[in-house]
């Protein structure tokens, strides 16, 4: 099972218009690198709670404050419409399945509600791309 690549334009629209994400990310300034196995990697840049850009080209040399990384299989489980046990959220996936949440732990813990909502929005974008 492989992860569905995320539509970054749709993701940017979702992030900018989702009231829960906007509320939880207020005052956040961070670069979030997302690594979906070998299939896709991108960086979300947030400045003062607003999406500044989503960079679709990320290298191992690019800096980040937070990294969400896992294999394609882990991401497939996380992005499923009904995720299997312990894949409903990044933190239990890290504890039980080896998913990685890395970077500035103080920022991660302070803004975890925004990071968790990010996962929900990733799921909504991925589910909309699955062919019927």
Segments and roles (model prediction):
Residues 1-132:
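Feature captures hydrophobic
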